[in-house]
Amino acid sequence: ACDNGRCKIYNLDFPDVIALRQQLLPAGDREQNIPCDLKDTAWFGKIDASGGAVFFASGVFYYFLTQEVRELVRGMADAFPGGVLVFDAANRTAVKMIAKTWLKTAKIKDVGAYFAVSDAAKEIGTWDSRLQVTSRGYMLGYNDLRDPSVSGFFRFLARVGDNGMKMQIVKIRF
């Protein structure tokens, strides 16, 4: 588990997303929503990592280049030793599907440069020796979908997402 019962939890996202999140899901105890440009580490100064810190970046890295995610992760490892970063990721095929409309609007041709992983531990783990990387399937890694109340079609979609598109929740301990 990431939470030791004392650590602070930080939700990281772009300011407009955090504003909406604040309306729909206000931060709980020990939790803080941080509106920021993750490419600018000025937000590091807002973090109190004493007692531990867990960072969530949900749905964010699909819009970042792999190099930008690598630099952020290394910077966080420097600034928050003992901290944890949790985010969702997917393979190249899934990222193309997820970002298709956005990429077309932004006139981006090289989708291959955008952050995508198939095997998080193997691919991200090589970025820095301090990183302890684990991942679980986005759907099947956390839920037992064999319950009769779960439709066969939903189970099929979960298998396609987790196995075919390598959709996953990644946890990096610094």
Positions of predicted regions on the chain:
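Alpha-helical subdomain
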Residues: 1-174
